[in-house]
């Protein structure tokens, strides 16, 4: 049995490209991809570079996952629901929570029979009025739920600083 021996100088922070395990190759919270079932790339070469995250597609595409964004002027949620028709989806607001529910009964696909159901809940930010929330379904099966954020109640203003002649902190009397 061969045992890989790594020199201590390779494990130092100056060499972040070398990882003795697959820990750094994992995308936590995401499902397994086909490439995860093949041997670890780090076992094939000690100088494996993990591709930067900006080269990967957003994690919610093709995974059934969602992406929640809070931008300067709006709040939005994108959710992959390509396996559901509009009639099989419900979006509702209960208090400060958006609930998305999807369900379809058993149907046949290329692998046999399948039924699906999911529930997702998203907290509405305090500066978004629940009455202004809308939803739409794109042709590629992405459900978008969004609402405008309230702007600050007035224009920005600079507050002048005044100088006082007395100290803010006075010494306590000695006993």
From Swiss-Prot:
Organism field: Sus scrofa
Start and end residues of each stretch annotated as Disordered: 142-175
One GO CC term, this protein: nucleus
N-acetylmethionine modification, residue list: 1
The UniProt record lists the keyword Glycoprotein: yes
Oligomeric and partner information: Heteromer composed of three CRYAA and one CRYAB subunits. Aggregates with homologous proteins, including the small heat shock protein HSPB1, to form large heteromeric complexes. Inter-subunit bridging via zinc ions enhances stability, which is crucial as there is no protein turn over in the lens. Interacts with HSPBAP1 and TTN/titin. Interacts with TMEM109; in the cellular response to DNA damage. Interacts with DES; binds rapidly during early stages of DES filament assembly and a reduced binding seen in the later stages.
Function: May contribute to the transparency and refractive index of the lens. Has chaperone-like activity, preventing aggregation of various proteins under a wide range of stress conditions. In lens epithelial cells, stabilizes the ATP6V1A protein, preventing its degradation by the proteasome.
Positions of Zn(2+) 1 binding: 83, 111, 119
Modified residues annotated as Phosphoserine in this record: 19, 45, 59
UniProt-annotated glycosylation sites, renumbered to this chain: 41, 170
UniProt domain sHSP: residue ranges: 56-164
Highest classification ranks of the organism: Eukaryota, Metazoa, Chordata, Craniata, Vertebrata
Record's subcellular location: Cytoplasm; Nucleus; Secreted; Lysosome
Protein name as it appears in the record: Alpha-crystallin B chain
Biological processes, Gene Ontology terms: negative regulation of apoptotic process; negative regulation of DNA-templated transcription; protein refolding; response to heat
UniProt main location, coarse: cytoplasm
Residues the record lists as N6-acetyllysine modifications: 92, 166
Residues that, per the record, bind Zn(2+) 2: 104, 106
